[in-house]
Amino acid sequence: LKIDDWKKAKAIADYNHALREQGIRDDNFIHSRRLWIPWHLVHCTEEEVVVDKKPGARPVNLGGLPAEPGSAERRYPIFGKTLEKTPLLSNRLNGRVFYLVSGHGGPDTGAQGSHDGHDLCEDEYAYDVTLRLMRLLLQHGATAYMIVRDPNDGIRDNPYLKLDKDEVVWGNKKIPFDQKERLQQRCDIINQLTAEHKKWGVKQQTMIEIHVDSRHQDKRIDVFFYHRKSSGASKTLATKLLTKFKQEYESQLDRTYHGTISTRNLYSLDNTQTPRAVYIELGNIQNELDQQRLLIRTNRQALANWIFQTFMSE
């Protein structure tokens, strides 16, 4: 297409992603290599505004370029009916790309615990925190990909998140039963998207993977972080996250924070190509005190907030 304008290229990509999200097209252009090109983006030299003839209708920006905060209604069904309206509050994170991976999903529930007769499954709680983070990033202009996706869960406020196994990955692909295949599938998606954005000149690309650990039920642990080996940028990000959590623990919870950062041979850290990659463990799903971090919706939101605020402070 000979398009060398970053904003225009990103607008075309966002247009195709939106069509995929809304079910208008059934394939992912990253995989199929087929782009749908809006006529106005290529052939109209000036931004056009069209107003629906219905009384009280709001102007619709056809340009598809980064919107002004509050300029248009944006809907993301993945967040659920209550929160699908996701207004743009700022463009602070415009030009930055995030790949968000919630651990496990599909046939793999991950770690399990129990509380008052209810089963607690790692994949459900990791997904809810990750989805909350996703919404915050989108509200401030980031491009964010939710790699593991549930078609009907949305953001949930109840303490006990019901287990299901209908999660898919980006592109509506079924999650394999084999563990290595599952991990490689996610890495392939992230690497393909990373390469595409790199071609468009995007330098700030970050992968965040969120899990819940499982230890002996007496072992209480604070949120801790792994970063990609031999990646100074990943270590720096993990350090910033650790610092943020330490500040919040000490100011809001009034207790000492014992989180850590380290490296570890984790498949997703070793086999993805984003400039930065951090793997987050939210707590011990077996421990009664750590479970409160997961069961209480405001705590899940706080976890997402602190991760998000770290990005906003960069």
Residue ranges and their predicted role:
Residues 214, 225-228, 251-314:
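Active-site-adjacent mobile loop/cap segments within catalytic or ligand-binding domains
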Residues 73-187, 213-216:
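Active-site histidine-acidic residue metal-binding/catalytic motifs
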Residues 108-121, 213-243:
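A short, glycine/acidic-enriched catalytic loop
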Residues 31-36, 41-78:
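Helix-enriched interaction subdomains in cytosolic or periplasmic regions
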Residues 19, 42-43, 104-107, 144, ...:
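Solvent-exposed loop/turn segments at secondary-structure junctions
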Residues 3-51:
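Extracellular LysM carbohydrate-binding repeats and other cell-envelope/extracellular binding modules
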Residues 97-101, 143-148, 205-210, 224-225, ...:
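Structural recognition of the beta-strand scaffold that forms the well-ordered cores
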Residues 2-7, 116, 120-128, 177-184, ...:
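Soluble non-cytosolic domains of exported or imported proteins
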